[in-house]
């Protein structure tokens, strides 16, 4: 397996911050650093990686509140999410104060991502899928070779992302899961934004919202 995966739960919301390390090069990416920077850096150190970029699935504070500080500290770029997520990122200072997260900075990602784009972590390629519904500019990262997806708050073990936030859309979320994620294969393991990992096949069998019987 060319990619090495570590998961560090961060913030009071226990958000799954993923650390991805290319085993061939040692290059690493941090996905969705919502907070607890020292905890994340300890995880990177334990995995033996050298962080080259930060990847973001979407703009909610528990996924990206520490992105700017971490990027500045490590002098690395931020890639993602899709540009419709500017709506949420611009609210970070207000949202983080309101929910007791300190005071996060507004930032402009170095690269907005679109459906069909690719991002590299060392020699490992991740395809980008735009999966709106939970938020308008949410993206999913898929490593075809390792059969691994980082899905943020699109899909969970036994559930799906909330769609009652501003600019959320339930029909869009269901459509994105069924038309973009399911075709990738039942054997694909995924890291959700919260809770345990699962596979697309398991969710197709048992998920009450997007399973084949739903």
Language-model segment annotations:
Residues 24, 39-46, 66, 176-185:
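A short, N-terminal amphipathic alpha-helix
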Residues 8-10, 102, 108-110, 130-132:
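Short Gly/Pro-enriched turn/cap motifs at secondary-structure boundaries
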Residues 2-47, 140-152:
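Conserved beta-strand hairpin/beta-sheet module of binuclear metal-dependent hydrolase folds
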Residues 20, 57, 131:
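Conserved S/T- and glycine-rich ATP-binding loop of Class I adenylate-forming
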């Amino acid at each position: 397996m060319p990619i090495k995966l570590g998961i560090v739960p961060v913030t009071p919301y226990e958000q799954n911050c993923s650390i991805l390390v290319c085993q061939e090069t040692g290059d690493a990416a941090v996905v969705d650093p919502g907070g607890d920077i020292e905890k994340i850096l300890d995880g990177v150190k334990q995995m033996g990686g050298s962080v080259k970029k930060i990847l973001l699935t979407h703009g909610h504070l528990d996924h990206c509140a520490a992105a700017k500080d971490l990027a500045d500290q490590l002098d690395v770029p931020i890639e993602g999410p899709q540009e419709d997520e500017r709506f949420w990122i611009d609210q970070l200072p207000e949202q983080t104060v309101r929910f007791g997260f300190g005071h996060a900075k507004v930032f402009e990602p170095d690269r907005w991502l679109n459906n069909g784009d690719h991002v590299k972590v060392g020699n490992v390629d991740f395809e980008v899928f735009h999966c709106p519904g939970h938020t308008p500019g949410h993206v999913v990262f898929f490593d075809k070779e390792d059969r691994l997806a980082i899905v943020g708050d699109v899909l969970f073990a036994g559930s799906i992302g909330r769609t009652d936030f501003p600019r959320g859309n339930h029909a869009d979320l269901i459509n994105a899961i069924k038309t973009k994620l399911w075709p990738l294969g039942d054997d694909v393991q995924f890291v959700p934004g919260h809770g345990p990992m699962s596979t697309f096949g398991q969710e197709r069998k048992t998920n009450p919202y997007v399973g084949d019987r739903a």
